[in-house]
């Protein structure tokens, strides 16, 4: 299970790196992972300060932490 969470976290990071900020439902659809794996992967990335979640109306938006985005471009 940990490997699946890590793989999903990697997919999330790659999509956000390529597309920028997305709504949580849109990101989940693009990743194609099911709950709770997707939720655990987002939590892992947030805990590691890799992503930032912001409240937007009735949902959340997620983006890479600016430091992470700079690292990707280096």
Locate each region found by the language model.
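A short, conserved structural fragment
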Residues: 46-56
């Amino acid at each position: 299970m940990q490997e699946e969470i890590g793989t999903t976290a990697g997919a999330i990071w790659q999509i956000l790196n390529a597309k920028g900020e997305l709504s949580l439902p849109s990101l989940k659809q693009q990743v194609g992972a099911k709950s709770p794996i997707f939720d655990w992967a987002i939590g892992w990335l947030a805990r590691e300060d890799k992503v930032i979640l912001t409240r937007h109306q009735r949902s959340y938006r997620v983006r890479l932490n600016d430091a992470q985005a700079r690292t990707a471009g280096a």
